[in-house]
């Protein structure tokens, strides 16, 4: 073939186009195979019962299907022909693409044979690689086609529908059907077709021999050669890493294995005639049990080769070689690759450390980075495909690696390092190209003995392009593009590799060497990202998800590997490289796989990290709990009740000495590892993983690992705080607020101390968690401590206070439990004193306290509703009493007619107890708010001072609402006003409601004397209150009155004066009562009048003096005091 025709044949261009096209066709075949093997995605026609007979008929008669005379068999197809055409067109066209691809491949292979091209991976690398890639791709397409079980049905059904619709078969069907039949036994047919190409294929493969042997060395040989080491020879550290064929140094061993196995499988004739071919083939058979066709589709090397060769004459020795190689691979390959992975972990870690410390070395030693990536990728992919396919083995440990995460992490680290310092790489290689490569190339071109015009033009353009480079292009961040130069070199390789070329590349190896060097240097300027994909793409995991997940789970169980777990979500970013433009329908599925697994891995990592954090928090809380004041009681007791030295030296058996706080830090030996040590170690490793990268992209989605950790920590902290409260709905047990607060502070202080290590916003986590705890439900709909404490105080403490088991002691500023038969499950004073109320306010915050108030007010309003009913029942009598309260004779007849007076007092007392508790909670809130926000508390108090009785009521309530939110007490309770306003009146007018409110005060006033009959109505000086909580009546009377008359826009003071007058008259009339039972605690009840005045901002002692003489109060105090001290004297002193 003439040189002119060699130029016109465009071998380089055709190889480039056909290889890309072949990958697309291969992926389409894979997609059809995958789709048809899954009943969920299979074409619906293949699953319909009515189609079964049609499908059997088409499969049996294929490709000679008589559509016109087979209506009884193809009736269902005829009915749905349009739908079948619409649905199966893509499938059919994909098979047609295979046929057309086959035609073009054979045309090109025959042309290359005719040109008698010379292939040598060390010289014409691109030409040889493209040639071998095309053969492997074509073989993979045919093998995958033969693995599609429904191929005949898909093609035959489409053609039947096409003929029914258009009256004739599809033009491609006859050839397509014949091709499908021919490749029912694909390898047999392929070996026949490739017989004429044996010389070219074997020549290309033999050029791999030296390279494959060198790249297939064991870990010991690598170690001896100090492979990938930059520090083994310090003087040569900055020398550029060069090779005669740079691309061969990072060429994948997996790719070479695929070339050799499939090449010799198709062109097996040379194995019997050429000992070098035989050696290379046997060496390759000893390396792997499986090679990849595409994604997870593999070729079982030894079985397939043995089956083929067994059917051929004269191949008995080769079959024996296969069996021997298989046994060697099973016995040794697992350990061989295991040792290489161990070596790479050490060597690449050293390389990454040096390059990270001195990134300038990435200039001269960039090749080392890509070699490291390629070596790691080869070992990982070998492990993955063998783990997936070798199911029965005596040595399963050969196909499992608990330390694989470290290799994956190092791969990601090298990739990140190259990306981060790409400018360093560009600056170095630009200078190399412009100041060295171009000079060497010029010398070589000038020394060529023969240089045809076409080749001369191409090489002159190389010199021109390289001479124009300057450093400003890198500084100005110009985009480089040397794709034209590389394609020209590919063309030049093709031109100089044909047999009749005037300029032969194999006769001018120096030209090949310098051009291969130039190609690598040009890639360092414009194709670094492509190089990273070529050498380190691990998108294979997208199709080995079970193995991927298993590796991740194994890594989580290995404490020393935890820091490398971030590599797994980072590798999900590789999945985007699986996409091919000829199969766009795959994109959503690949995207879902990538995002789902990335999300799953990060969720598991965040979950494990948050679990570890919360476990340490729990330990810190336990240590903090040991320092609580309650635990020093035993120490104080022992110190107080010291006995003899002997007794102290010999403590009783069964009474172990309690460890003092801090004892956990004492160690006799540092090798003793505590649970806390293990947790801290695990947390350190996990924190390194979660904080390794700020963000990364997966299929155009930006992923922030810290956000996963933040959300998990927030949720776990929420649950932990609720768990700390220790609420038991059955026994109504709960932790004291002060103890819960101490525990929460221990949790928070530890989490905040981790802020710089976790990479998460600790302040935001804590803030959000605590804020959610101030709401009734958290973000996941679970109960919070606000709900738990609100329910507990209402259902336990206040309910028992209403029944008289618990008493409010103003002297102690707490509720206290009264001694009763049977043990109480809690002590009221431990949950309601000043410190506890302050702690409660600290935990619940203003929002939580508002929720508590709203619940308290609901209970108050429910009592008010009942009180209104009682007033309405006694309306007529109360109206008369209100008019005639100063007439003793008439009152004596009216009072007995009242019903439910005791009920009124009881319900009003309950309201008073609730409001008293709320007041205590508000005081706690005020103290906390003042401590946290003094700059806010000042203006709020100042604003409250500006409110006068003349201020508009809406403005007043708004200001009071603000003040109440900060815990400041107000003359009128806005929460109570709002709660009463929300009560639904039974079609009653405001005037009637107002009348009921007035009569309620009258009812209370005339009912007060009834309290004197209750033995519990004795005023206790010690408690500064009554054992039946009637001192809470005063708060109820004042606050309910203020709320009611504010609501009805009436004068509060006037109505409270009326109450004072009526109550005074009622109590004064009690003084004339002769029945001792009715006057039993008259003096104690009289004191209520003073308590009412003290409680109210609207009443004064002068007002009280005008209707109830102060002398009576003074006498009452004296009598109550005398009776109290008499009761405390021992019985013998009476």
UniProtKB/Swiss-Prot annotation:
Q: Which domain of life is it from?
A: Eukaryota
Any one GO CC term of this protein is:
plasma membrane
Any Pfam family the entry gives: Nckap1
Entry's transmembrane regions: 999-1019
* InterPro entries with a match to the protein in the record: Nck-associated_protein-1 (IPR019137)
User: Which keywords has UniProt assigned to this entry?
Assistant: Cytoplasm, Membrane, Transmembrane, Transmembrane helix
Q: Describe, from its UniProt entry, the tissues in which this protein is expressed.
A: Predominantly expressed in developing and mature hematopoietic cells. Also detected in urogenital tissues, including testis.
Q: Where is the composition biased (Basic residues)?
A: 639-651
Q: How does it sit in the membrane?
A: Single-pass membrane protein
State a single Gene Ontology molecular function.
Answer: TORC2 complex binding
In which residue ranges is the amino acid composition biased (Basic and acidic residues)? Answer: 652-666
Region of interest: Disordered? 638-671
Q: Which PANTHER family match?
A: NCK-ASSOCIATED PROTEIN 1, NCK-ASSOCIATED PROTEIN 1-LIKE
The subunit field of the Swiss-Prot or TrEMBL record says: In hematopoietic cells, component of the WAVE2 complex composed of ABI1, CYFIP1/SRA1, NCKAP1L/HEM1 and WASF2/WAVE2. Interacts with ARHGAP4, PIK3C3/VPS34 and PPP1R12A/MYPT1. Interacts with mammalian target of rapamycin complex 2 (mTORC2) components, including MTOR and RICTOR.
Put simply, this protein is called: Nck-associated protein 1-like
For this protein's source organism, the top of the classification is: Eukaryota, Metazoa, Chordata, Craniata, Vertebrata
């Amino acid at each position: 073939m003439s040189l002119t025709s060699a130029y016109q044949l465009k071998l380089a261009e055709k190889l480039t186009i056909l290889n890309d096209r072949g990958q697309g066709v291969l992926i389409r075949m894979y997609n059809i195979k995958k789709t048809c093997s899954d009943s969920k995605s299979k074409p619906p026609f293949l699953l319909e019962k009515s189609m079964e007979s049609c499908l059997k008929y088409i499969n049996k008669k294929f490709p000679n299907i008589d559509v016109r005379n087979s209506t009884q068999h193809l009736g269902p197809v005829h009915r749905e022909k349009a739908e079948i055409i619409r649905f199966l067109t893509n499938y059919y066209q994909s098979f047609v693409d295979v046929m057309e691809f086959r035609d073009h491949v054979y045309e090109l292979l025959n042309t290359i044979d005719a040109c008698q091209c010379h292939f040598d991976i060390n010289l014409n690398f691109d030409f040889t690689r493209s040639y071998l890639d095309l053969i492997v791709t074509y073989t993979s397409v045919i093998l995958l086609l033969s693995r599609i079980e429904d191929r005949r049905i898909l093609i035959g059904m489409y053609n039947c529908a096409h003929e029914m619709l258009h009256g004739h078969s599809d033009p491609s069907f006859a050839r397509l059907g014949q091709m499908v039949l021919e490749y029912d036994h694909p390898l047999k047919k392929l070996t026949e077709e490739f017989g004429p190409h044996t010389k070219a294929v074997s020549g290309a493969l033999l050029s791999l021999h030296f390279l494959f042997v060198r790249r297939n060395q064991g870990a010991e040989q690598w170690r001896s050669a100090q492979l990938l080491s930059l520090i083994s020879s310090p003087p040569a550290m900055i020398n550029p890493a060069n090779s005669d064929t740079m691309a061969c140094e990072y060429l994948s061993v997996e790719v070479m294995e695929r070339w050799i196995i499939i090449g010799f499988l198709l062109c097996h004739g040379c194995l019997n005639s050429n000992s070098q071919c035989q050696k290379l083939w046997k060496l390759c058979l000893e390396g792997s049990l499986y090679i990849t066709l595409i994604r997870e589709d593999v070729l079982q090397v030894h079985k397939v080769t043995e089956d083929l060769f067994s059917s051929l004459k004269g191949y008995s020795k080769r079959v024996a070689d296969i069996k021997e190689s298989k046994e060697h691979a099973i016995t040794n390959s697992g350990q061989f690759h295991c040792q290489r992975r161990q070596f790479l972990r050490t060597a690449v870690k050293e390389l990454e450390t040096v390059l990270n410390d001195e990134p300038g070395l990435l200039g001269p030693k960039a090749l080392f980075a890509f070699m490291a990536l390629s070596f790691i990728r080869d070992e990982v992919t070998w492990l993955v495909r063998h783990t997936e396919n070798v199911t029965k083995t005596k040595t399963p440990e050969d196909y499992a690696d608990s330390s694989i995460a470290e290799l994956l992490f190092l791969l990601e680290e090298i990739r990140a390092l190259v990306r981060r310092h790409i400018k360093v790489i560009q600056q170095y290689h630009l200078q190399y190209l412009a100041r060295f490569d171009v000079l060497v190339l010029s010398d070589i071109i000038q020394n060529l003995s023969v240089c045809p015009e076409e080749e001369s033009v191409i090489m002159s353009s190389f010199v021109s392009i390289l001479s124009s480079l300057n450093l400003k292009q890198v500084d100005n961040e110009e985009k480089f593009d040397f794709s034209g130069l590389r394609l020209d070199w590919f063309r030049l390789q093709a031109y100089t590799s044909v047999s009749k070329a005037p300029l032969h590349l194999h006769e001018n190896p120096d030209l090949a060497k310098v051009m291969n060097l130039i190609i690598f240097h040009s890639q360092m300027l414009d194709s670094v990202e492509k190089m990273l994909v070529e050498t380190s793409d691990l998108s294979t995991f997208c199709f080995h998800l079970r193995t991927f997940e298993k590796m991740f789970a194994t890594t989580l169980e290995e404490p020393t590997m935890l820091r490398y777990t971030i590599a797994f979500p980072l590798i999900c970013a590789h999945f985007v490289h699986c996409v091919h433009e000829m199969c766009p329908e795959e994109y959503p599925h690949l995207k879902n796989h990538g995002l789902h697994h990335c999300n799953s891995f990060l969720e598991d990592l965040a979950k494990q990290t948050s679990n570890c954090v919360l476990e340490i928090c729990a330990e810190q809380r336990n240590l903090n709990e040991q320092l609580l004041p309650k635990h020093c009681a035993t120490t104080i007791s022992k110190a107080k009740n010291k006995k003899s030295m002997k007794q102290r030296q010999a403590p009783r058996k069964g009474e172990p000495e309690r460890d003092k706080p801090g004892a956990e830090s004492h160690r006799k030996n540092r090798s003793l590892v505590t649970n806390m040590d293990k947790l801290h170690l695990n947390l350190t490793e996990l924190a390194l993983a979660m904080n390794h990268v700020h963000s990364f992209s997966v299929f155009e989605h930006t992923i922030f690992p810290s956000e996963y950790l933040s959300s998990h920590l927030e949720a776990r902290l929420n649950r932990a705080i609720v768990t700390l409260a220790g609420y038991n709905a059955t026994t109504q047990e709960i932790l004291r607020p002060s103890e819960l607060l101490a525990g929460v502070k221990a949790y928070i202080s530890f989490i905040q101390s981790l802020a710089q290590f976790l990479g998460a916003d600790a302040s935001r986590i804590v803030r959000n968690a605590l804020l959610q705890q101030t709401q009734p439900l958290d973000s996941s709909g679970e109960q919070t401590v606000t709900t738990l404490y609100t329910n507990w105080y209402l259902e336990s403490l206040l309910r028992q206070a209403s029944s008289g088991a618990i008493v409010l002691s103003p002297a102690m500023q707490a509720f206290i439990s009264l001694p009763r038969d049977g043990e109480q499950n809690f002590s009221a004073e431990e949950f309601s004193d000043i410190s506890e109320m302050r702690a409660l306010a600290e935990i619940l915050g203003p929002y939580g306290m508002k929720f508590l108030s709203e619940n308290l007010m609901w209970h108050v309003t429910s009592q008010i509703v009942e009180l209104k009913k009682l007033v309405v029942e006694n309306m007529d009598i109360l109206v008369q009493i209100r008019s005639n309260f100063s007439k003793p004779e008439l009152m004596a007849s009216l009072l007995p007619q009242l019903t439910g007076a005791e009920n009124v007092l009881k319900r009003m007392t309950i309201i008073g107890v609730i409001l008293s508790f709320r007041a205590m909670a508000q005081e706690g809130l005020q103290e906390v708010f003042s401590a946290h926000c003094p700059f806010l508390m000042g203006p709020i108090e100042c604003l409250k001072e500006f409110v006068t009785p003349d201020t508009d009521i809406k403005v007043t309530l708004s200001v009071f609402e603000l003040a109440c939110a900060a815990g400041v007490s107000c003359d009128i309770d806005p929460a109570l006003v709002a709660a009463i306003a929300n009560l639904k009146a039974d079609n009653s007018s405001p005037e009637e409601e107002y009348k009921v409110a007035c009569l309620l005060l009258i009812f209370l006033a005339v009912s007060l004397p009834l309290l004197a009959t209750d033995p519990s109505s004795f005023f206790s000086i010690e408690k500064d209150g009554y054992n039946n909580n009637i001192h809470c009546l005063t708060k109820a009377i004042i606050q309910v009155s203020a709320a009611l008359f504010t609501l009805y826009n009436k004068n509060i003071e006037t109505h409270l004066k009326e109450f004072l007058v009526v109550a005074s008259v009622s109590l004064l009339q009690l003084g004339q009562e002769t029945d001792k039972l009715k006057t039993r605690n008259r003096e104690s009840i009289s004191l209520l009048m003073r308590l009412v005045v003290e409680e109210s901002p609207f009443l004064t002692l002068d007002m009280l003096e005008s209707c109830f003489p102060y002398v009576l109060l003074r006498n009452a105090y004296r009598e109550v005091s005398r009776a109290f001290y008499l009761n405390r004297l021992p019985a013998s002193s009476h």
